[in-house]
Swiss-Prot record:
It comes from Odorrana ishikawae. It holds the Pfam family FSAP_sig_propep. Residues 1-22 form the signal peptide. It is found in: Secreted. Belongs to the frog skin active peptide (FSAP) family. Brevinin subfamily. Disulfide bonds join 60-66. Residues 23-43 form a propeptide. Has antimicrobial activity against Gram-negative bacterium E.coli ATCC 8739 (MIC=50 ug), against Gram positive bacteria S.aureus ATCC 6538 (MIC=3.1 ug), methicillin-resistant S.aureus ATCC 43300 (MIC=12.5 ug), B.subtilis ATCC 6633 (MIC=12.5 ug) and against fungus C.albicans ATCC 90028 (MIC=50 ug). This is Nigrocin-2ISb.
Length: 66
């Protein structure tokens, strides 16, 4: 009976460690995705800002109202 309890305790302990490692890996993956999304948003903002400035310059040049 005692060896059965030790075996069950060992399995529980190893399972807990395994779940902990999986959670850490999942969190790291989410952080990588968040960083990638933030970079893409920053690139989009930069491109849109440039397009709006260029459009404003074109409208200003064509109409002469600056």
């Amino acid at each position: 009976m005692f060896t059965l309890k030790k075996s069950m305790l060992l399995l529980f302990f190893l399972g807990t460690i395994n779940l902990s490692l999986c959670q850490e890996e999942r969190d790291a993956e989410e952080e990588r995705r968040d960083e990638d999304n933030a970079k893409m948003e920053e690139i989009k903002r930069g491109i849109l800002g440039t397009v709006f400035k260029a459009g404003k310059g074109i409208v200003c040049g064509l109409t002469g109202l600056c």
